[in-house]
From Swiss-Prot:
GO terms for cellular component: chromosome; DNA topoisomerase IV complex. Topoisomerase IV is essential for chromosome segregation. It relaxes supercoiled DNA. Performs the decatenation events required during the replication of a circular DNA molecule. Mg(2+) 1 binds at residues 417, 489. Belongs to the type II topoisomerase family. ParE type 1 subfamily. GO terms for molecular function: ATP binding; DNA binding; DNA topoisomerase type II (double strand cut, ATP-hydrolyzing) activity; metal ion binding. NCBIfam families: parE_Gneg (TIGR01055). ATP binds at residues 4, 41, 68, 109-115, 333. Heterotetramer composed of ParC and ParE. Its EC number is 5.6.2.2. This is DNA topoisomerase 4 subunit B. It comes from Pseudomonas aeruginosa (strain ATCC 15692 / DSM 22644 / CIP 104116 / JCM 14847 / LMG 12228 / 1C / PRS 101 / PAO1).
Length: 629
């Protein structure tokens, strides 16, 4: 087993950015996220098999104390930085023993971005460490060291652990008070997800003391949560599988008569409130198994094909994924974006659910009936759209590769820059619900073109016919696709084309934008190869972040960085995984929150008559531009 001391702590960068932009590192509505970071570190000790209990105390002065019986933070001097490990962990951003996997196989808190952020956003932090038969104490004020590490007593050799007591700084939060209900919810979830761990919460304001301890984790948690509701099956469908780099466990059931459902997902015991690729994988695995079950038994009525939402409706689940190097959208870790999670979870769940359905055929048939009935309702509610093979109304553009499905709200149209990329996209798409229309070169700048004349442009005419909505029309009844996705290269030309298309939709198809139907796909600009591992980066900042992390992990080999010159350079499999697969892609919805401000900026950028304003803007703001070479 690896020794966990100061030289196991790796440093990536300083603490300065946190106070300037606290919202990038934590949820600033309340200090609950700070509590979660400290709790995560203690729970990581339990995950690694070093701690059996975690105690959380909310004091009357609104400070919070988290105590565990793990190994204790390192107190020896770091070989490169020349300060004790505990000081490094609390004063340097991205300092921790969790970047490589020597000290923790799976970890949620990066002893790093988390606990140093707690220090940066607190007026005072007091850390006590029991380790090597001594008890140590160190204090911090406003993110800086307030007192040196000192020995304050002796303890038994086996008496180890860490206590972190912090006072959140009210100026960084909308409300400086902890939400007790949310705190208790997180703590109960930790106990559920780490069977055998004892978690205690004490509120000194009310005298309340609660202890959670689950030997039968997910199953009993889910059963308790939906105890009063009719459910199918009666006992949750549970499963788990642990690989060398990832592990997944779940408990799920359906609530045929509805009711308040539980839908919770976690990565390395961190709640992912916005789901992510692991939840997408669970949904896909259940769908694949149910489709197979229905087809094998010939249960599907003619013309009915199960969609993900048919199986997902009225589901209650708890999903726990453990993986090395999870990637999240944003620092607050609320959505998992690691692409490999979707494939791992869907494969494991599909195999397990297929087996379970066939072993419990009677319940399987009831669940199939439920899904088929959901599909029937969906088909009845949605109008059908005639696809390209039907010749009536205006002829659809010849270059449109339409999808087969007839439900407009499920269908997606990708407007793809260039014919070569269009070819890759046609191979990468799911023909059932994804249509492709290649665009030749840059479209017309339509910002100042009158609504009646805009259709004179062949490209704009083809887009209007394909989507089924005329420029300027407010009636979206004939809309043929629920999502219209702009897919252009990640380089400067691609951004120009994407801007012109956004301008077209904002100026001439505004009701589409306001109804949330227009999206911009985010293809990666870089691919990073290191051995067998592949990482994709959206831009330079993400590329640098991945390279920094790989350097901190001290992985063998030199990373090979490839810059995609265009979508056509990606093979169909890469394009599908990074840009088109709903389980693993990134799509940004085009919204108009501040319509007046947005229209003013776009007018200044796109109107021919405002060249003078553009020049002034470039002179005053040109230094803020990102130059893409």
């Amino acid at each position: 087993m690896a020794t966990y001391n100061a030289d196991a702590i790796e440093v990536l960068s300083g603490l300065d950015p946190v106070r300037k932009r606290p919202g990038m590192y934590t949820d600033t509505t309340r200090p609950n996220h700070l509590a979660q970071e400290v709790i995560d570190n203690s729970v990581d000790e339990a995950l690694a098999g070093h701690a059996k209990s975690v105690q959380v105390i909310l004091h009357q002065d609104n400070s919070l104390e988290v105590i565990d019986d793990g190994r204790g933070m390192p107190v020896d001097i770091h070989p490169e930085e020349g300060v004790p490990g505990v000081e490094l962990i609390l004063t340097k951003l991205h300092a921790g023993g969790k970047f490589s996997n020597k000290n923790y196989q799976f970890s949620g808190g990066l002893h790093g971005v988390g606990i140093s952020v707690v220090n940066a956003l607190s007026t005072r932090v007091e850390v006590r460490v029991k380790r090597d038969a001594n008890e140590y104490r160190m204090t911090f004020a406003d993110g800086f060291k307030d007192s040196d590490l000192e020995v304050i007593g002796t303890v038994g050799k086996r008496n180890t652990g860490t206590s972190v007591h912090f006072w959140p700084d009210p100026k960084y939060f909308d409300s400086a008070k902890f939400s007790v209900s949310r705190l208790k919810h997180v703590l109960k979830a930790k106990a559920v997800l780490c069977p055998g761990l004892s978690v205690v919460f004490e509120d000194k304001n009310t005298g309340e003391r609660v202890e959670w301890h689950f030997e039968d984790g997910l199953r009993s948690y889910l059963t308790d949560a939906v105890a009063e509701l009719p459910r199918l099956p009666d006992e949750p469908f549970c499963g788990n599988l642990e690989g060398s780099k990832e592990a997944v466990s779940w408990a799920l059931l359906w609530l045929p008569e509805g009711g308040e459902s539980v839908q919770e997902s976690y990565v390395n015991l961190i709640p992912t409130a916005q789901g992510g690729t692991h939840v997408n994988g669970l949904r896909q695995g259940l769908l694949d198994a149910m489709r197979e079950f229905c087809e094998f038994r010939n249960l599907l009525p003619r013309g009915v094909k199960l969609a993900p939402e048919d199986v997902w409706e009225r589901i209650a689940f708890v999903l726990s994924m453990k993986m090395q190097e999870p990637q999240f959208s944003g620092q607050t870790k609320e959505r998992l974006s690691s692409r490999e999670a979707a494939a791992f979870v869907s494969g494991v769940v599909k195999d397990a659910f297929s087996l379970w359905l066939n072993e419990h055929a009677e319940i399987g048939l009831q669940l199939a009936e439920l899904a088929i009935s959901n599909a029937g309702r969906r088909l009845k509610a949605g109008k059908k759209v005639e696809r390209k093979k039907i010749t009536q109304g205006p002829a659809l553009p010849g270059k449109l590769a339409d999808c087969a499905g007839q439900e407009p709200m499920r269908a997606e149209l990708f407007l793809v820059e260039g014919d070569s990329a269009g070819g890759s996209a046609k191979q990468a798409r799911d023909k059932e619900f994804q249509a492709i229309m290649p665009l030749r070169g840059k479209i017309l700048n339509t910002w100042e073109v009158d609504g009646g004349e805009v259709l004179a442009s062949q490209e704009v005419h083809d887009i209007a016919v394909a989507i089924g909505v005329d420029p300027g029309a407010s009636d979206l009844a004939q809309l043929r696709y629920g999502k219209i996705c702009i897919l252009a290269d990640a380089d400067s030309d691609g951004l120009h084309i994407a801007t012109l298309l956004c301008a077209l939709f904002v100026r001439h198809f505004r009701p589409l934008v306001e109804a949330g139907h227009v999206y911009v796909a985010m293809p990666p600009l870089y691919r990073i190869d290191l051995g067998k591992d592949i990482y994709y980066a959206l831009d330079e900042a993400e590329r640098d972040g991945i390279l920094e992390r790989l350097a901190a992990e001290k992985k063998r080999g030199k990373p090979q960085v490839t810059r995609f010159k265009g979508l056509g350079e990606m093979n169909p499999l890469q394009l599908r995984e990074t840009t088109m697969d709903p389980n693993t892609r990134r799509l940004v919805q085009l919204t108009l929150e501040d319509a007046t401000g947005t229209l003013e900026i776009m007018d200044m950028l796109l109107a021919k008559k405002r060249a003078g304003d553009r020049k002034s803007w470039l002179e005053s703001k040109g230094n803020l531009a990102e130059v893409l070479v």
